[in-house]
From Swiss-Prot:
Expression across tissues: Expressed by the skin glands.
Residues annotated with Pyrrolidone carboxylic acid modification: 1
Family: Belongs to the frog skin active peptide (FSAP) family. Tryptophillin subfamily.
Localisation: Secreted
Protein name in UniProt: Tryptophyllin-T3-3
Example GO biological process: defense response
Xref: Pfam families: Tryp_FSAP (PF08248)
Keywords: Amphibian defense peptide, Pyrrolidone carboxylic acid, Secreted
Amino acid sequence: QDKPFWDPPIYPV
């Protein structure tokens, strides 16, 4: 759990 994840699986890479 390092990346902020919302309802849609969106990961700022």
